[in-house]
Amino acid sequence: MSDIASRVKAIIVDKLGVDENEVVNEASFTNDLGADSLDTVELIMEFEKEFDIQIPDDQAENIATVGQAVSYIEDAKK
């Protein structure tokens, strides 16, 4: 697991209070991890802060799973 992936996973565990074993790439924030719309906004904000990136709203709407978040952040950090 990359450093980015492990940091994303840690943020999700902290913010959503889920077991880290549930936080797999295919897991949907809302359907699998129980996040509501406010939770997803807070996750995006936390990703921006942690990785010092900006995620435009139109892009944030496309980040629905753990794997999508990791991929987006990895691309943004290149």
Swiss-Prot record:
<keyword id="KW-0444">Lipid biosynthesis</keyword>
<dbReference type="GO" id="GO:0000036">
    <property type="term" value="F:acyl carrier activity"/>
</dbReference>
<dbReference type="InterPro" id="IPR006162">
    <property type="entry name" value="Ppantetheine_attach_site"/>
</dbReference>
<keyword id="KW-0276">Fatty acid metabolism</keyword>
<comment type="function">
    <text>Carrier of the growing fatty acid chain in fatty acid biosynthesis.</text>
</comment>
<comment type="pathway">
    <text>Lipid metabolism; fatty acid biosynthesis.</text>
</comment>
<dbReference type="InterPro" id="IPR003231">
    <property type="entry name" value="ACP"/>
</dbReference>
<comment type="similarity">
    <text>Belongs to the acyl carrier protein (ACP) family.</text>
</comment>
<dbReference type="Pfam" id="PF00550">
    <property type="entry name" value="PP-binding"/>
</dbReference>
<keyword id="KW-0443">Lipid metabolism</keyword>
<feature type="domain" description="Carrier">
    <location>
        <begin position="2"/>
        <end position="77"/>
    </location>
</feature>
<dbReference type="InterPro" id="IPR036736">
    <property type="entry name" value="ACP-like_sf"/>
</dbReference>
<keyword id="KW-0597">Phosphoprotein</keyword>
<keyword id="KW-0596">Phosphopantetheine</keyword>
<protein>
    <recommendedName>
        <fullName>Acyl carrier protein</fullName>
    </recommendedName>
</protein>
<dbReference type="InterPro" id="IPR009081">
    <property type="entry name" value="PP-bd_ACP"/>
</dbReference>
<feature type="modified residue" description="O-(pantetheine 4'-phosphoryl)serine">
    <location>
        <position position="37"/>
    </location>
</feature>
<keyword id="KW-0963">Cytoplasm</keyword>
<dbReference type="GO" id="GO:0005829">
    <property type="term" value="C:cytosol"/>
</dbReference>
<dbReference type="GO" id="GO:0009245">
    <property type="term" value="P:lipid A biosynthetic process"/>
</dbReference>
<keyword id="KW-0275">Fatty acid biosynthesis</keyword>
<dbReference type="GO" id="GO:0000035">
    <property type="term" value="F:acyl binding"/>
</dbReference>
<dbReference type="GO" id="GO:0016020">
    <property type="term" value="C:membrane"/>
</dbReference>
